[in-house]
Amino acid sequence: PQPEIIELIQDKRKQKQFYTSNNIPTAKYILTNSKQEVVDNKHFLPAVNKLGTEGYDGRGVQILRTVDDLDKAFDKQGLLEKLIDFDTEIAVIVARTVTGEIVTYPAVELVFHPEHNLVEYLFSPANVSAEVAKKAEKIAIEVIEKLGMIGILAVEMFVDKKGDVLVNEVAPRPHNSGHQTIEGNITSQYEQHLRAVLGWPLGKTQQILPAAMVNILGHEGYTGIARYEGMDEILREEGVHVHLYGKKITKPYRKMGHVTLVAQEPEILKNKVNFVKKTLKVKA
């Protein structure tokens, strides 16, 4: 993406201000500069304390539900974001060319690790109503247009209990929430990104089959040279595709790769996802 867009997006404070200044729906928030300022705003709890910069893969995020959690607050520039009572988390991948052509991919449903704030697995398409899917698509298009961005943009969103869709954050690149497009959609997010930045016509985004993605994470309690258990077993499964990142050293919850899966039926797909999660382990 363009340098000015990287500058905006790499700071979550600037991101949130961009959303509010452009009337893009997002959770209420307060900018903070220190741990004391977080404590001073305890009336805003329950909330999520996010670092302005340096956060990635779940790092730089603390959930503060009550005053007893305030010790976990960051003593750096960041923000307090109102904790959303959401039904599900979704993402829409959107692409835009220099000529303004835009396409979106079907919304995907994200399932996060309960403790480490990073995506554990996802399903595509998301199990949401047509109305919610349409809202999410419209918001993703609005975000990439307002940014004036060229390339692929992943827009992560909450769907609350009322069916409202709120932007959480965005990533200006091929993203974890689009890996399944390699096997699951007519055009992968990687090919689409190249088409967008080269000014070529954008590819079709329709879903070929129900698809899923499971992140391969370092197993808890193991640090050292990575050793994969269960690889042979999962590779025998039809529709299972392993993508490793070539990282030699594993650490607890480090992203070591991902598995993309396709199946004819959503129920079969869920069973395959559970099998991969249970079988494939990264130890040392």
Residue positions per predicted region:
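Active-site nucleotide/adenylate-binding loops and adjacent lid/helix of ATP-dependent enzymes
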Residues: 6-91, 95-143, 277
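A short linear hydrophobic-aromatic micro-motif
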Residues: 28, 46-49, 78-81, 153-154, ...
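A short, glycine/Asx- and small/polar-enriched loop/turn
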Residues: 43-44, 160-166, 253-255
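Short acidic-glycine loop/turn motifs at beta-strand connectors
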Residues: 96-101, 160-163, 263-265
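Protein kinase-like catalytic core scaffold
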Residues: 103-106, 153, 165-169
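Short, flexible active-site loops
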Residues: 116-126, 169-182
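Active-site "cap" helix and flanking loop/linker of ATP-utilizing ligase/carboxylase catalytic domains
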Residues: 135-155, 161, 171-223
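Peripheral (often C-terminal) accessory segments that flank ATP-dependent C-N-forming ligase machineries
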Residues: 195-284
